[in-house]
């Protein structure tokens, strides 16, 4: 299925390649790099070349490119590539070029176990950790001295179990189960402040450290909100269809329990607003005035706010005064960035000033749009609430907790 895998950095350099069925020249990545240069934020997930199909995934600062000789289900390969990145993050804490280069040996060992002759084999983190021990300082020193590797000499118990995602014999002094409900808001707001488009991409991440073989049931106050869901294999889907409950025997450690999508604009409460005034008169200086404030946040603080505007090509410079945060203007890309930070409702962040344009300009480009980033802790903008968590099969009482986070996805305000 997958012949080769290439990992490409942000500069377009292939810094790792792995071949299973046949050696594919890294020159095939030029098709991917051409597509990336043409549309950096909209690279096609599947690229057809004369001899191979390239299936790509971009995560943070690296891109994974899988080369397949025959037609394959693209989503199958895309899901596998995401599993590869998730496994690297679980093992090393990050999936960046420097981290991968520092752990080349373990990376190749993992890829050998995760794919067998081009077909996915072991992708569950708990099984992989029994096969290949995560690196640490003492183990690295010992392996250097003895010449051994991180590969285990025994077959993992989970491989023969009916529950392959959970290893046997798990024991903790403190038993705890924590859930993070994270929602990303994708929205387009028009010039008058009306919502043109809005949807929510959400997911529930878990940190489960429970002894034995617990059987958990998670219920929601309003489960009918979900338009589309995707579950970890541990979730009993028939129970969800019948009762709208998440019933599962959890993996040990960190994992993503479910992803969901909410597309009804009536449910998506836009958590911020922007008052704006941008005007340019032909051949003269223009004015810019922006104010950002919270809305529908239930008193929660809006944090990590950042605004980015791509100004018209005729703009030479911006002389602005923010009452909060700092701004920068790149005269080459015509990008204005304003790092606001936290919004104080008693004094709303504002930036205003003059904009100088090329003398004699007669044709003014369209007004810019504002791309917004933000975070709101302890708020699920959809109104989703976890009702309760019940545990069966074990007699102890675990510590339980739920955190909510709303943040901007592709959030754009037109001016």
Where in the sequence are the language-model features?
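Intrinsically disordered, low-complexity Ser/Thr/Pro/Gly-rich interaction regions
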Residues: 132, 142-415
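Acidic, low-complexity cytosolic segments
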Residues: 1-176, 182, 188-194, 206-212, ...
């Amino acid at each position: 299925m997958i012949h080769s895998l290439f990992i490409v950095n942000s500069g377009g350099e292939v810094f790792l390649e792995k071949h299973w069925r046949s050696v594919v020249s890294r020159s095939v990545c030029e098709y991917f790099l051409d597509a990336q240069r043409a549309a950096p934020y909209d690279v096609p997930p599947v690229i057809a070349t004369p001899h191979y199909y390239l299936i790509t995934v971009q995560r943070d600062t690296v891109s994974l490119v899988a080369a397949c000789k025959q037609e394959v289900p693209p989503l199958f390969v895309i899901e596998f590539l995401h599993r590869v990145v998730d496994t690297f993050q679980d093992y090393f804490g990050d999936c960046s070029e420097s981290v991968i280069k520092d752990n080349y040996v373990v990376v190749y060992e993992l890829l050998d176990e995760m794919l067998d002759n081009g077909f996915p084999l072991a992708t569950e983190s708990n099984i992989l950790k029994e096969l290949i021990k995560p690196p640490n300082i003492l183990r690295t020193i010992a392996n250097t001295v003895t010449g051994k590797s991180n590969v285990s000499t025994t077959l993992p118990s989970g491989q023969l179990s009916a529950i392959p995602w959970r290893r046997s014999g798990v024991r903790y002094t403190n038993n705890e189960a924590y859930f993070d409900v994270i929602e990303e808001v994708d929205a387009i707001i028009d010039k008058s402040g009306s919502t043109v488009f809005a949807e929510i991409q959400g997911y529930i991440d878990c940190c489960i450290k429970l002894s034995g073989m617990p059987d958990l049931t998670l219920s929601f106050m309003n489960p009918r909100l979900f338009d589309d869901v995707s579950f970890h294999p541990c979730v009993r889907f028939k129970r969800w269809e019948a009762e709208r409950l998440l019933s599962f025997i959890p993996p040990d450690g960190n994992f993503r329990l479910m992803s969901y999508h909410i597309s009804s604009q009536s449910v998506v409460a836009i958590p911020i607003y922007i008052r704006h005034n941008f005007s340019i008169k032909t051949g003269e200086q223009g004015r810019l005035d922006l104010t950002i404030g919270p809305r529908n946040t239930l008193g929660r603080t809006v944090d990590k706010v950042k605004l980015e505007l791509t100004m018209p090509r005729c703009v030479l410079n911006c002389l602005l005064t923010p009452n909060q945060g700092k701004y920068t203007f790149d005269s080459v890309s015509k990008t204005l960035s304003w790092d606001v930070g936290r919004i104080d409702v008693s004094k709303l962040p504002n930036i205003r000033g003059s904009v100088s344009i090329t003398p004699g300009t007669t044709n003014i480009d369209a007004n810019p749009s504002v791309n917004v980033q933000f975070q709101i802790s302890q708020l699920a903008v959809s109104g989703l609430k976890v009702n309760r968590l019940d545990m069966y099969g074990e007699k102890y009482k675990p510590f339980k907790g739920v955190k909510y986070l709303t943040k901007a996805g592709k959030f754009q305000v037109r001016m």
